[in-house]
Regions:
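Bacterial N-terminal signal peptides
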Residues: 1-6
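Compact, glycine-rich, soluble single-domain proteins
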Residues: 11-143
Length: 143
């Protein structure tokens, strides 16, 4: 799945995964090329054991229903920004600069259906904030 960040057009043309867009600041859009983590095994492994990640890449965790979620950075060597979103794809919380290998729990909220992990610093540099909207075909309008 791809998610355009505005930092590179590589996500648009060379994406081997899925493409996703985030709309923020009214008319601004960022795209990223992201892997989807849909089942329990994929969600548990996440980005663990990865040594690097392209600037416009990421991973989106998809849950069957809105729920309480917490993340940690165990075995994850890439510093990340973690974006939590509700059933409609609306960004409800952002945790910036999650520390590699930390086992400290990062609570995302109670009604989270989607979690997007991107390279640390991108939410701040792009101005992505709670209230923004994640768009992808898996996120149905009106949810």
């Amino acid at each position: 799945m791809a998610f355009w960040v505005g930092v590179s057009t590589a996500a648009d043309t060379n994406c081997a995964h899925e493409q996703i867009s985030i709309y923020y600041k009214t008319k601004h859009k960022a795209k990223f090329c992201v892997e989807l983590a849909i089942n329990n095994e994929e969600r548990q492994r996440g980005l663990m054991f990865r040594k690097e990640m392209e600037l416009s890449d990421g991973m989106m965790f998809v849950y069957d229903r809105p729920q309480s979620v917490s993340f940690w950075m165990k075995n994850t060597s890439i510093p990340l920004d973690i974006i939590f979103a509700d059933e409609a794809g609306k960004i409800t919380k952002i945790f910036e600069n999650a520390r590699p290998f930390s086992t400290t729990s990062i609570f995302g909220g109670y009604d989270v259906k989607y979690v997007l992990e991107i390279n640390a610093g991108l939410t701040k540099s792009l101005g992505i904030k709670p209230g923004g909207l994640i768009k992808h075909s898996i996120i149905l309008p009106g949810n």
